Every structure is written in structure tokens, then in C-alpha cells.
Amino acid sequence: PQTFVTLEIIPGDAEDNSVRKIIEIEREIVELEERAAKSKIYSLNKNGSEYKIGIIDLPSFYLDFEAWQARDPNYKSSSKDVKNILEDFKKQSVDAVLVDLRNNSGGALTEANKLTGLFTSAGATLQIKESNGNIIPWGDARVRQAWSKPMAVLVNRYSASASEIFAGAIQDYQRGLVIGQRTFGKGTVQRLDNLSEGQLKITESKFYRVSGDSTQSRGIDPDIVLPSTWDIETVGESSLPTHLPWDKI
């Protein structure tokens, strides 16, 4: 059935809160297939030899929570899709992989954890610091490494949250190069509490790289910097007036 959400908006140039606009938007179902991982293989000739480079375009760290909680074995997730792509790359004798996380704003923390495990078996993916000060290392020993050949990660200023967890772990374990621009700098974890007329999002913890550095505010600095079409000082967590500061554990 058709359902709608009503937004009450106060224009930024309004002199007082009595000036409001009412906008009604029809809800639509977002199909996971529309933002699923995609792959391409390019051939590169160097010194008379041909190399195959596999590109994985990952727009988000998606997970079908309802199917996963219902223990549906066919639930959709980014880590499952990427694993299938890597298996296909092996069959086609791909020499190296580039994971494209540009404009990937994040997603499920568990998926960032599992995806990291597909490329390295080194250990924890990240550390989470709770509001009470407890520090919990995160890793998933059940995930088997699916790719051991060379790899790199492509990021930009809009790569955030789970993207930064993945890129940071790949960099900290020296598993591959991070290429592009400094990432967004979102290093916090949120939860959703249900209310009678909606939900409340609460920031409850911060995550840290295995090196102990936070990604909050500073993001991930790439190993190889590519030119940017925008000023990084006007985009990202650090550009927000009330952002939480960077720290380390």
C-alpha cells in the first residue's frame, strides 16, 4: 500500500519559526540490487606482459537485516556478493583487485568487518570504545580470506564510516595501498531506538583503527593522493561546527 511521510520545513532565511513549509513524500521500496557490488576486468600491458585488473565498485556496505535475522540462507549482503566476485576473478586469472569505495557513505559495521576478512586474516578489524570507556576489539574469525593477491582501495572525501574502517584496516595491516583523497572522517557508531511516531538515532560509541587512531574528524589519509575537484576543508566531518574531535587509544 502507498504510504507517505510529511516533512515540516523551516526555511534557512526565515525570520522566525512560524514560517514553515509542508512537503509530502511518497515512500518507495529501495531494492538492494540497485546498490549491489558490481565488477569489471581491465587488461593492462606493461613491459610486454599483460595483467588483468579486477575492479569492484561497492556503493555501500549493505545487508538485508530482516532476511539475516530470519536466518534466510539466501540473504543479500555486500560481503557475500564481493566474495562471489572474487571467486569469479580467480577463475578468470585476475592479477590484482581495486576496491572502489568512492562516495560509499558506509552501512553495516558487521559487513565492513567481514569484507576486511576476505582480504586479510591478520586479526581484528577495528576497536570500539563504548560510552563507559570499555574498549572492544572487533574481528570475525569465521571469515576466510578469499583474496591473497595484490589489492588496493580507492577512496574520496565522501567515503565514510564503514568505508573508513575497511580502508584503515587494509592500510594498517599493509595489505594494500589506499589511493585517492582524505576520507570523510565519521568515526562514531549509532543505534536506532523506536518511538511511537518514528525513531531516535543515538551516538553511543566511537570506533578506532587497529593502530589506535580514530577516524573521527581526520578520516583516512591515502598512501597515494589523487587531485580533488573540491576543497576538503568544506566537506566532511571536520567541516561541521559541532563535530567530535579526533583522539586515539
Predicted regions and their residues:
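Conserved functional hotspot residues or short segments at active or partner-binding sites
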Residues: T215-I249
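Cleft-lining beta-strand/loop regions that shape enzyme active-site pockets
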Residues: P1-S196, K206
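Short, functionally important structural connectors and interaction interfaces within domains
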Residues: N17, G117, Q199-L200, Q216, ...
